[in-house]
């Protein structure tokens, strides 16, 4: 058994190195044609078996952040190459361009200074968004949301979920995002979260099929109320709902995503979320979570006591 687990670990690290090496090739925007609507493709996505139906999807928080600079094309490429879903953050610049970055200012993750919403795209694109993490990423640019969508469409082997975190609600941002989501045919893969209710209403006005989310749900009472919210296609929760609560959410067509101890390597939380059959987990440790589950499955198949 030790030898088998050792082999699993070696496979894990080989895959990781491959993904990061692939990500390092992302030095300029990926050029990809916007996808056209294909009803047969959409039907195939809805009917084909999907791991998400058997265990929670793993949302790589800001991409594969432990191995690449957060919210950059290499971080997203590495995640998608390994079949992970992605959580990312979006702002609108002063010239109404959509960029992917977490903080309100560019100070922490670039060599510049200033508020994202008060800068033009050209000003932001002059900055280095990679060397703060490691010298091999020197010259990396803050990506646009369109570049992120292009990359995901090009690199995904099967559809991955995109969780789009709304950081600041600038005028017109909902319609701009909706147009881009439609352009790349990502309505069935994406949901937006973090926005207030009036912003969710504007998203629905822009496109009724764009999934919006209620956040900051920390207990069963709030969970029950959120299930009745017509603007809550998804629930972003900070606790583990029971299996019965999850079953009820599914009957209502709601998805439930866990945002609890994102930065911590908490196998107990991962296991509880899996047992409850949650739709997904947002974490900085998606590969370690997947490996933990695969080892559990292997041990169970071989009759190994996991206590």
What is each residue range found by the language model?
Residues 33-66, 130, 137-140:
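Long, acidic (Asp/Glu-rich), low-complexity accessory segments flanking structured domains
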Residues 38, 43, 137, 213-307:
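C-terminal active-site rim and adjoining tail of enzyme catalytic domains
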Residues 58-60, 86-88, 162-164, 190-192, ...:
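Hydrophobic faces of well-ordered beta-strands that scaffold small-molecule active sites
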């Amino acid at each position: 058994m030790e030898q088998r687990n050792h082999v699993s670990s070696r496979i894990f690290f080989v895959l990781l190195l491959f993904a990061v090496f692939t990500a390092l090739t992302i030095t300029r925007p990926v050029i990809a044609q916007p996808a056209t609507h294909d009803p047969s493709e959409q039907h195939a996505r809805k009917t084909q078996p999907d791991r998400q139906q058997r265990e929670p999807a793993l949302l790589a928080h800001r991409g594969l952040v432990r191995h690449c600079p957060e919210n950059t094309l290499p971080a997203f490429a590495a995640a998608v190459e390994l079949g992970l879903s992605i959580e990312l953050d979006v702002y609108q610049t002063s010239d109404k361009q959509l960029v992917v970055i977490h903080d309100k200012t560019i100070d922490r993750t670039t060599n510049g200074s200033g508020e994202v919403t008060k800068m033009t795209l050209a000003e932001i694109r002059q900055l280095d968004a990679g060397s703060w993490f490691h010298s091999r990423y020197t010259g990396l640019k803050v990506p646009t949301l369109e570049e992120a969508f292009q990359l995901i469409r090009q690199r995904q082997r099967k559809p991955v979920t995109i969780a789009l975190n709304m950081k600041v609600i600038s005028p017109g941002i909902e319609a701009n995002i909706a147009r881009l989501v439609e352009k790349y045919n990502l309505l069935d893969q994406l949901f937006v979260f973090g926005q207030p209710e009036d912003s969710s209403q504007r998203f629905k006005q822009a496109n009724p099929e764009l999934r919006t989310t209620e956040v900051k749900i920390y207990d069963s009472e709030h969970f029950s109320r959120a299930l009745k919210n017509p603007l809550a296609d998804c629930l972003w929760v900070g606790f583990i709902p029971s299996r019965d609560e999850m079953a009820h959410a599914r009957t209502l067509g709601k998805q439930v995503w866990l945002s609890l101890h994102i930065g911590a390597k908490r196998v107990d939380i991962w296991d509880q979320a899996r047992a409850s059959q949650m739709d997904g987990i947002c974490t900085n440790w998606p590969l370690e979570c997947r490996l933990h589950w695969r080892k559990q499955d292997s041990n169970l198949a071989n009759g190994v006591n996991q206590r």
